[in-house]
Amino acid sequence: MAKHLFTSESVSEGHPDKIADQISDAVLDAIIEQDPKARVACETYVKTGMVMVGGEVTTSAWVDIEEITRETVREIGYVHSDMGFDADSCAVLNTIGKQSPDINQGVDKADPKDQGAGDQGIMFGYATNETPILMPAPITYSHLLVKKQAEVRKSGKLDFLRPDAKSQVTFQYDQGKIVGIDAVVLSTQHCDSVTTPDLREAVMEEIIKPVLPAEWINKDTNFFINPTGRFVIGGPMGDCGLTGRKIIVDTYGGAARHGGGAFSGKDPSKVDRSAAYAARYVAKNIVAAGMADRCEIQLSYAIGVADPTSIMVETFGTEKVAHEIIIEAVRQNFDLRPYGLQEMLNLLQPIYKQTAAYGHFGREEFPWEATDKAAILADFAGL
């Protein structure tokens, strides 16, 4: 593949699906802050004037679901009926039940180290050295654009913006290296009074130019800013939102494979989440160690069983040492049992709400982004 294009998209914290993700993770955080061993699977549905929170929770904690929901919506910025959604007046329905004891008997063990996986499934982790944070550039810059949109909206710099927004960036590659940006799409909800030309100019000057590196922009780069011309009706009034519907935005923007399991609202006993974080941690440390330029890890689990049923390492021909050495390094230096990866990544803490917008990976504040194993792996491989 000599020359090619690759595109990824992101959505803002005010996108309906992301509202749902953030509510689910806010509930999770509130519960595990009181009860770190709680079992939580929290799903959220949002539509005009309504939020429904459901799922299965087994815990000794008590949390105020309604207040958590309203505060989350308020922080995002839906605070007036003019936006089609209002934190203070929306209905909040709570339909949470308990997790099945059939699951508990497979997960909970006398020795915590023998804790079984909360479900079967496959999970992928990925890293590439095309950016300093070892993430693919298209998803990285798509996230940065909508994050900047929220920043200038909340600061009042562009006070005509509203919470809902989407971005999309197409990168040009030659021999696997970035040579430029081919296209940029940014659509943002706005108030009715701003004109389309004024909005487009403001978005270009205050969002796009400060975020995208100038050396990747050229005269042939295409910009599509609110291409329909009008985006007043947005958020839950424009579309209903559901937890777990932005799994590619949450991960690698399509640059790596995905096992299908969503993250938000799930406690760390759910390997859909915790093992995907661990797989990223492993892949990132392999690349940081210089063992490969690109790395994808696949893990699989059986419900109630501690050890992974399989571990796969793919380096796409970019490995600097024998493939067998990389695999052995993974087996000797990472505990990928559910209990082991929870301990390794310190997952039993209330850090999940902040993961629920702008991507779960490539953000240094999260423990699975540490490269503390890189030196150990490099030494193991003789690099």
Curated annotation (Swiss-Prot):
Cofactor(s) recorded in Swiss-Prot or TrEMBL: Mg(2+); K(+)
Catalytic activity: L-methionine + ATP + H2O = S-adenosyl-L-methionine + phosphate + diphosphate
Subunit-level organization: Homotetramer; dimer of dimers.
Matching HAMAP family: S_AdoMet_synth1 (MF_00086)
Region (Flexible loop) location: 99-109
Xref: Pfam families: S-AdoMet_synt_C, S-AdoMet_synt_M, S-AdoMet_synt_N
Protein's name in the database: S-adenosylmethionine synthase
Species, as recorded: Vibrio atlanticus (strain LGP32) (Vibrio splendidus (strain Mel32))
Residue positions binding L-methionine: E56, Q99, D239, K270
Entry's localization field: Cytoplasm
Gene Ontology molecular function: ATP binding; magnesium ion binding; methionine adenosyltransferase activity
Involved pathway(s): Amino-acid biosynthesis; S-adenosyl-L-methionine biosynthesis; S-adenosyl-L-methionine from L-methionine: step 1/1
EC code(s) of this entry: 2.5.1.6
